[in-house]
Amino acid sequence: MIDLRRYADREHLLLASYAMHSRDTRGRAHPEPPHAYRGPFARDRDRILHSSAFRRLSGKMQVFTGEMGIYHRTRLTHTFEVASIARTLARTLRLNEDLTEALALMHDVGHPPYGHCGEDVLGECMQDVGGFSHNGFALVIVQQLEQRYPQFNGLNLSYETLAGQDVRAHKAEASRGRSPMLEVQIVDAADSIAYDAHDVDDALQMGLLSIDELAQLAVVRRALDQIRARRGILPTQQLRQSLVHELIDLQVSDLLRVAIERLRSVEGRSTEEVSDAGLRLTHSDALAEERTELESFLFDAVYRHERLMAVRAAAALRLRTLFEKLNETPERMPLRFRQRAKELPIQMAVGEYLAGMTDAFCDQQYRQITETPVGPLADW
């Protein structure tokens, strides 16, 4: 049995003053006794990791192509990549690693099937009931839909973990001048870093782009220069893998340099005081400009590629059709969502049901409900 006072003492030694300390948690909606050897945020992390919604991320594509192959990234693999980068940032900056990991594991739990086009379709279909946001739906999942405990609905996560996700769900409503806690900021940064680097990787793997095309971008040229200086000329496959690693390392290193410098000014202050001061962890101006160039290029060359646009149009048709059919015949939904339809507007209950589906299950439901003998979208 571990004395939790020693756990708090260990945090006091390892974490910076501006990190979120376990001893300062505001607790849970449903009070629970402390765990024998895990702090509150470690428990949150484990509850998210073992949730049904988290496991379903393995069946949702990161960038929807219709091809669920061994290589392709899913929301689950992306989430683990984000968590890995976020933990590195947290450890280096002496922030709370358990809280950071919990936030990273939760950040994509609310994503619907079919990638971002799935979110766009649900947003349109649900506009009369407030639209759809995967960040907001993640909170619905962990507070209501997950049913793992007899005493309450949801996972009963700590206030800080829920508040961190709430910031992501309501960014436009965030009070000006006050910044999110630092653990939230580095998860956002890790998500963006992983997203850009791995979209480059996937685009190269699928043949949508070549390294020569990418080399016109400043941040890619810089990464390639670093690789050649250290390793010389590499075969194409090794060069692609090295490029992804170097893009991540460049961005992480830049963020840490800026963060370490800014955090010197708040040494000794609490997490609340740092938020009140509005301190934000960002990339340097130079790298931020290069990242904007990269993201703009990827948007035009990859996300709007005619091959992917055709698949997404088919996916959008399927999801929109399912939404309409289930609104007309909600009795086709499982019991718990039929019950939700009695408590909520029917569009919200249908949207929640669809948002929880994997890509393959959505295809299956489309075939069953429309009685259309179509194959997977990879065949389009």
Residue ranges and their predicted role:
Residues 69-77, 90-91, 106-113, 126-129:
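Short coil/turn segments at secondary-structure boundaries
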Residues 1-79, 83-89, 96-98, 118, ...:
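Histidine-centered, transition-metal-coordinating active-site segments
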Residues 99-127, 135:
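Aspartate-rich (DDxxD/NDxxD/DxxxD) Mg2+/diphosphate-binding motifs
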